Amino acid sequence: MKNLATVEDTLTSWPQVLLNTYGTPPVELVTGKGSTVTDADGNVYIDLLAGIAVNALGHAHPAIIEAVTTQLSQLGHVSNLFATRPVVEVAAELVQRFALDDATIASQTQVFFCNSGAEANEAAFKLARLTGRHRILAATNGFHGRTMGSLALTGQPDKRIPFAPLPSGVEFYPYGDLDYLTTLVESDPTDTAAIILEPIQGETGVIPAPEGFLTGVRELCDKHGLLFIVDEVQTGIGRTGDFFAHQHEGVTPDVVTMAKGLGGGLPIGACLATGEAAKLFGPGKHGTTFGGNPVSAAAARAVLSVIDEEFCADVARKGELFAEQLRGVAGVADVRGRGLMLGVVLDQPVAKQAVTAGFKHGLILNAPADNIIRLTPPLVITDDEIRDAVRALAAVLAELNA
């Protein structure tokens, strides 16, 4: 057996052998349990990022460990030329969670599995084009991925411009502006295929859609025969206190994309379609080698077995506790979001410095903007961990604002 390459120091070797897409990380994490992680020097942190909203059940959750270990010992990968039970069970459960026990909706809903949120949005993009119409309307500041198709849907010029020309036919509307969106649709309704949005924009600072906006978009799509695509990659799987964030308004999209928390740390994404949208794909129209891998599907099945209605209600409660505690911290101007997807708006542009200072105070933070800290902790975070995190963040901000 060949001796594998040896690495003397992880952080020193990182920039030598990995393409410079992320810069060099500040710490090397080696273990995790629940809502905490430990670095190579033994420092313990409360993880308020959860792998960017991925580790819904935290680190080393026993249900995921058991499911993955059992499945991998039986069958690891076979491709979609063959059926495996885990993928069918996960699809059936997602259909039920989407349909909210409406048998008619459930009977018209199907799922495509892939590996990530970007791939799920690529599938949604292709569904929209299969309607025979060309235009897709996406929100300014929205984020749907970094592959070429999902990047075309992303309303952030700094991410788009270096890779032009992107797939054509995407036009942008101000997020939350229903009047502008209506005018844009009605400028060419017969060539407009779909409207895509996130219920809460995460990458630009945790910005919820205005109340009633999703309902208005649903009505606009119904009027003109458009697909309503909701990107739940970051907001879905219980993150906001509802299983899907769009359920907060009681709307039913035509297409829902998801990933991140679905696998609880293993790579799996999904594009769910209902009604006429579910009839657009046929054999050969789309595919993926690893999508629906039985090991990732087993992990997703374990996640879904834990995240039930009672669990989601507790996420909502913990989110309210977190927000209430944060609003009392000096240096915090506002807290927005729902459930355990929160944007902490600071009264000074020190969010990026807070991320760095957070390590010294035992916190893993994320700053999508100069004055915003994004919090997406594991959904299993405890009340005591929330209070400890708020105290630590208060110390960070006091230090920076001194």
UniProtKB/Swiss-Prot annotation:
Give the sites modified to N6-(pyridoxal phosphate)lysine: K260
- CDD domains according to UniProt: OAT_like (cd00610)
Predominant location: cytoplasm
Query: For binding pyridoxal 5'-phosphate, which residues are annotated in this chain's numbering?
Result: G117, A118, F143, D231, E232, V233, Q234, T289
Known Pfam families for this protein? Aminotran_3 (PF00202)
Spell out the family assignment given in the record's similarity comment. Belongs to the class-III pyridoxal-phosphate-dependent aminotransferase family. ArgD subfamily.
Q: What is this protein called?
A: Acetylornithine aminotransferase
**Pathway membership, UniProt:** Amino-acid biosynthesis; L-arginine biosynthesis; N(2)-acetyl-L-ornithine from L-glutamate: step 4/4
State where the protein is found.
Cytoplasm
Query: Which residues of the sequence carry a binding annotation for N(2)-acetyl-L-ornithine?
Result: R146, T288
Q: Which UniProt keywords apply?
A: Amino-acid biosynthesis, Aminotransferase, Arginine biosynthesis, Cytoplasm, Pyridoxal phosphate, Transferase
GO function term, MF aspect, one? pyridoxal phosphate binding
Q: Which domain of life is it from?
A: Bacteria
